[in-house]
Amino acid sequence: MGRIIGIDLGTTNSCVSIMEGNTTRVIENSEGARTTPSIVAYQEDGEILVGASAKRQAVTNPKNTLYAVKRLIGRKFTEKEVQKDIDLMPYKIVAAENGDAWIEVRGTKLSAQQVSADILRKMKKTAEDYLGEPVTEAVITVPAYFNDAQRQATKDAGRIAGLDVKRIINEPTAAALAFGLDKQEKGDRKIAVYDLGGGTFDVSIIEIADVDGEKQFEVLSTNGDTFLGGEDFDQRIIDYIISEFKKEQGVDLSKDVLALQRLKEAAEKAKIELSNSAATDINLPYITADASGPRHLSIKLTRAKLESLVDELIERTIAPCRMAIKDAGVSVSDIHDVILVGGMTRMPKVQEMVKEFFGKDPRKDVNPDEAVAVGAAIQGQVLTGERKDVLLLDVTPLSLGIETLGGVMTKMITKNTTIPTKFAQTFSTADDNQPAVTIKVFQGEREMASGNKLLGEFNLEGIPPAARGVPQIEVSFDIDANGILHVGAKDKGTGKENKITIKANSGLSEEEIQQMIKDAELNAADDKRKLELVQVRNQAEAAVHSVTKNLAEHGDKLDAGEKDAIAAAVKALEEALKGEDKAAIADKTTALMAASQKLGEKMYAESQAAQAAQGAAAGAGNAGGAGGASDASGKPAGDDNVVDAEVKEVKKG
């Protein structure tokens, strides 16, 4: 097994980490940053930009620049959270044939998995550039409160990116691993991980125990909201700016896609600035224009105003904290440490509310942007077998069950059950001579199945005729270490059985995944071709510049035929540069270098002759004799202006 990288696939930013021995290393991307914006832009010429380069061009290409796509992964188009995003996002969210929420870009429908795969591919390449070897395996993190469909979709995104996802791990659990591994405190410690990221919120209560020299991380409970995060905070600021601008100037910016993209950038910047200062100015010249001319936006935003705008959002994080404490069977006073994860936890008001609830200051020795990726890398090392002193016991965040008579949700596995786990229960038919049963699998906490999320359904057919209640049908649930569910149904009388991995009514089919992998490989090949073309083009342009300059300066040393040959080769290469044929450009560059060889030889000979002449002149000056007497030092007698000295460099201050 090779190196397993740890990837934090975030809503706003992503991060990649590896283990070097027992030390974790967060890897800088090609721009030198330790985190990469989770933004993907699709250019007109087919080029795909990921990260900072995509973010930079977002203002001029808002409809084809995708951000916060993690909020759509594994979701149905009809879900209320998705419907809410449709009105807010500059890009077009559409319904796929299977009912999932997809995105339309330049007339092509893309799944959230494909877009996420572009981000994962960038993280994969970041690791490969650092390690100098191919990377094929990863541990990817997800919010603890992600349901089965969202976990499966994240795994599929990894496959499309060319990664074998060895484990899906919960973000708060990963952060706890990063925090707890180097702590020397003895005895059991209970920690709360409060994770408020760009698009999701999680809280987990985790017990770290020392068991015979092994660190055991046991998740006692988890709770959260997969549609609450920094993006919502940004939106509150954007809405405020729009309403203030409308009051002052009578212009509504809410339907101006270009203006909205600039407002998004400004809101994010203002939010970050207000974590360190009491007020900030938002200045956006030429934000829009009407018949009277251009309009400029200038608004002062104070920290107090920001806090009043987002107070209700921060308040929404407290109910899950309360529930997590209750489900863990502990009290707030039992919590030893509170760890903050996610960029939003830098906001003073968030820290204040967390302190108020838990009754203690949160720890400051955890990097909120990097801890999750670091924890994923640690888990990767555990999976390779290199690390044997860590045991991770995670839980399923939501109850799982099936629909039974009357539409009731019969729970098979309750929330916060340690995984992996198995459970089986026997059911029977509802009607006489019923030939088949449909098993509908749901996830959620509501008493009626219709109030929960339908994960999938399948049939068990060929049940022999019998009175209702007689057939014995065993339904088994099996959750693997990734939190992904496998369900089976077996007729005990006939031995007939049927099994599925839950992904039937949602997500991508195997054919779609394979097609997307092929598309990604084609894109990678295309990217390689483009890079090679750019490199050849750069060499050619440098050759044209160099030869043209040398010809102008030293062309008089050549005869007319040689000059004409070089000029013709330059012209041929310039023509080739107008096209996209890499081989033609390379050939013409080689031809130009061959044609200009004579020029190079003449320049070299001229340079050698000049150096020889210089040496001869210097020798004559030092020879003494008829040219004038000199003393023993070689200094002409009576010349007081010539001084013997050691030469040393003097640095200018």
Curated annotation (Swiss-Prot):
What are the start and end residues of every segment in region (Disordered)?
607-653
The entry lists its GO molecular-function terms as: ATP binding; ATP-dependent protein folding chaperone; unfolded protein binding
Q: Could you tell me which CDD domains the record lists for this protein?
A: ASKHA_NBD_HSP70_DnaK-like
Write out the biased-composition intervals (Low complexity). 607-620, 629-640
Which terms are listed as keywords in the entry?
ATP-binding, Chaperone, Nucleotide-binding, Phosphoprotein, Stress response
Top-level taxon of origin:
Bacteria
Task: Describe what upregulates or represses it.
Answer: By stress conditions e.g. heat shock.
Does the keyword section mention Chaperone? yes
Q: Which residues carry this modification: Phosphothreonine?
A: T200
Query: HAMAP family per the record?
Result: DnaK
Described by its record, this protein's role is as follows: Acts as a chaperone.
Family, according to the entry, reads as follows: Belongs to the heat shock protein 70 family.
Name under which the protein is recorded: Chaperone protein DnaK
Species? Verminephrobacter eiseniae (strain EF01-2)
